[in-house]
Amino acid sequence: MAKKVVGMIKLQLPAGKASPAPPVGPALGQHGVNIMGFCKEFNAKTANQAGLIIPVVITVYQDRSFSFILKTPPAAVLLKKAAGIESGSGVPNKTKVAKVTKDQIREIAETKMPDLNAGSIETAMSMIAGTARSMGITVEE
């Protein structure tokens, strides 16, 4: 028989740096999950992605066990890393803060493809380019 799901928790955590401190502790604690067990497992699986924010979906079962699925980092985080900037523009339509190439957009789109509801790499690239524009990043040919 399948385990009964009692909760789904969605968090965005820095890769390899999950700790029982907020926001992890309170979110997992209210469902009775072993917080240290989750932190150790998450940190082990994300150790090679240091510096990125990793979204994670944790499924909590009735017997207090859990499983989790790692998603790809948000497009904005990948774009900031590719452009080498700390944050996007406050006024993206007026102030442009950086430039990225089509090749960088393609690379990010290929990374994000499993989590995007895009049929082809071209549509995924246009989604990523839209995110870049809304952050004040210019896309060059």
From Swiss-Prot:
One of its GO terms (cellular component) is cytosolic large ribosomal subunit. Gene3D superfamilies: Ribosomal protein L11, C-terminal domain, Ribosomal protein L11/L12, N-terminal domain. It comes from the Bacteria. Part of the ribosomal stalk of the 50S ribosomal subunit. Interacts with L10 and the large rRNA to form the base of the stalk. L10 forms an elongated spine to which L12 dimers bind in a sequential fashion forming a multimeric L10(L12)X complex. The lineage of its organism: Bacteria, Bacillati, Bacillota, Clostridia, Eubacteriales. Keywords: Methylation, Ribonucleoprotein, Ribosomal protein, RNA-binding, rRNA-binding. It holds the Pfam family Ribosomal_L11. InterPro entries: Ribosomal_uL11, Ribosomal_uL11_bac-typ, Ribosomal_uL11_C, Ribosomal_uL11_C_sf, Ribosomal_uL11_N, Ribosomal_uL11_N_sf. One or more lysine residues are methylated. Forms part of the ribosomal stalk which helps the ribosome interact with GTP-bound translation factors. One of its GO terms (molecular function) is structural constituent of ribosome. NCBIfam families: L11_bact. GO terms for biological process: translation. This is Large ribosomal subunit protein uL11. It comes from Clostridium botulinum (strain Hall / ATCC 3502 / NCTC 13319 / Type A). Belongs to the universal ribosomal protein uL11 family.
